[in-house]
Amino acid sequence: MSYEEINKQLEPFKLMVFDEGTEDVWATLVLWLNEDYKQNVFDTRLEEGFVGNGYDWNSLAIVFLEEKMPELMEVLSFDSEAGLFSIGSEDVEAVKKFAVGFKAMCNDESEMTDLLSRAILD
């Protein structure tokens, strides 16, 4: 499957791969937070300080990884900011696996809300 096809499945997330085929290959999954994607889920913890920014997505992703894909914890790294969720690795397949699983979780708002209930505010 091409990256274009993968990215259609992952919208509004975007998978980017840099320097593919070299020692310096790097893959990143990003979500620019310029829309209200799944804001209603984060609003369930608004009184606790969750606002749906990149750091909150980070907190959700950590719970997701711990519970669903613990084998990826050591190979993925976060580089989120207030307006951007970003996770990446030199292991392109690990980023793809995370991306597909994380997007599937986001498509199930009850699962997403459940995982967010265990997230720790950053």
Identify the function of each model-found stretch.
Residues 1-97, 104-122:
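Structured alpha/beta or helical-core interaction and ligand-binding surfaces enriched in interleaved
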